[in-house]
Amino acid sequence: MAASAFLLIASFMLVLLLLARPLGSFLARLIEGEPLPALRRVEAAVWRCCGNTTAEMNWWQYALAILWFNLLGLALLFALLMTQGSLPLNPQGFPGLSWDLAFNTAVSFVTNTNWQAYSGESTLSYLSQMAGLAVQNFLSAATGIAVAFALIRAFTRRSSATIGNAWIDVFRITLYVLLPISLLIALFFVSQGTLQNFLPYLHISTLEGAQQTLPMGPVASQEAIKMLGTNGGGFFGVNSAHPFENPTVLTNFVQMLAIFLIPCALCFSFGQVAGENRQGHALIWAMSLIFVVAVVVVMYAELAGNPHLSELGSASNINMEGKESRFGILATSMFSVVTTAASCGAVNAMHDSFTALGGMVPMWLMQIGEVVFGGVGSGLYGMLLFVLLTVFIAGLMIGRTPEYLGKKIDVYDMKMTALAILVTPTLVLLGSALAISTDVGRAGILNPGAHGFSEVLYALSSAANNNGSAFGGLSVNTPFYNLLLAFAMFVGRFGVILPVLAIAGSLCAKKRQPAGNGTLPTYGPLFIGLLVGTVLLVGALTFVPALALGPVAEHLQLWLTK
């Protein structure tokens, strides 16, 4: 089993790096503003038709463009979900959603969270899935990448007042990156058996003579961008555990690769644009170290399973509850880490059925800000926030003004960094406290005790950090949870984006100083260790008390009771 685990992790990382390196070089061209020569005229025609100026923006103009663009998308998606009952491409005749569920779902997909308080095959029409959710899968992903582009430019520009043009960035990211790669992935999924049709649901008779309904729909096209854009919202309720979404071990492997592909490629892009590839390599090393350790811990926990099973006569303690036999323990454990290290949230098993320790690791990966590769764009700018915090701490220790890539890090930068890092923990802890201290919050908990608290903590961690996965034992389709989680998702998304863009505006205006004898190298093993330690320390100080009340207590109850 250990050899199989090693081969799975090693092969995944090898293929990921081989694919991410050339994509990173291509993304670097987009960051530096180089359009594809073949599409230069197409771009010019689009801007003429839209009446859009190609002039660059300062940070607050960029932020306003991103914010208004997403608010418009939220309003349109909300209207579509409310009125789907009277719109076409609804062969099952599903009615419109309730206002609170429609609002929660609209916020969820606009913020790249894809939290789902519903089951897609029994709630949404094909039009809502395609024109609503799938469109936002592209646009929310493009938003995150665009913000990362702006921050990368800020580190590399000298005495500049602008960080790029939001409209051009979103357009190029969608047209040149997300659409073509999604098309290739969708075709591969179709070849493996993923559904792609517009048929009404099929009613069949099983071998036992019972009647069964098989859901249909344009699944593969949505599945591709769901993974590539680290969105995570499934066409079906059980997400990638459904054989119509994720039919084979090969599609499972490709889905994991798709989740990490752009976040890893952006690290290469960062190093290339900065003029020092080793800067990007250092980020990849730091992310990979945390990722591999997390995978090993979850695999160990799920293989150790439940010690009480052997007492009941079971031949094995391995925890297969809630898992698909076609994937097995190792691939399922790795998928759970990939999807929560990134802000994806897609699942190929029920995380609520993991062991206490196995479920705690995905929860913790979300709580540290999903900076282990992370979401498309958000993973990189989230990790760069920790980089700024690390160089600030290192500067305090050696008595020098902190700097990164030749840019001095001043008080304003650190205030914005602290604000961005503290937004999501505040939402998680205060939201969890509100849920468990009110009757309407406690009413949704189906499993009392430590695990019930873990379900609430997981839900708020997932929403605030824009992940979207869940512990299924919590009833969240209520006005209380729909509104609470929608607030956490929106503030968790834009409450981080705005400080990041403010940092970008501050950094791009500064001169880039040459490195001196006392400059801290930000690419070697020492800095990688400091960066990993900072991420772990912030996560530990913030969430250990809450984790002790939930998964840690549950783990001790399981292993110390007879």
Swiss-Prot record:
Superkingdom: Bacteria
Pfam family, one: KdpA
GO cellular component: plasma membrane
A single GO molecular function term of this UniProt record: potassium ion binding
Record's keyword terms, sorted: Cell inner membrane, Cell membrane, Ion transport, Membrane, Potassium, Potassium transport, Transmembrane, Transmembrane helix, Transport
Disulfide bonds: none
Membrane-protein topology: Multi-pass membrane protein
Cellular localisation: Cell inner membrane
TM ranges: 6-26, 62-82, 132-152, 170-190, 253-273, 283-303, 327-347, 356-376, 379-399, 416-436, 483-503, 526-546
PANTHER family, per the entry: POTASSIUM-TRANSPORTING ATPASE A CHAIN (PTHR30607), POTASSIUM-TRANSPORTING ATPASE POTASSIUM-BINDING SUBUNIT (PTHR30607:SF2)
Stated role: Part of the high-affinity ATP-driven potassium transport (or Kdp) system, which catalyzes the hydrolysis of ATP coupled with the electrogenic transport of potassium into the cytoplasm. This subunit binds the periplasmic potassium ions and delivers the ions to the membrane domain of KdpB through an intramembrane tunnel.
Subunit structure: The system is composed of three essential subunits: KdpA, KdpB and KdpC.
Similarity field: Belongs to the KdpA family.
UniProt name for this protein: Potassium-transporting ATPase potassium-binding subunit
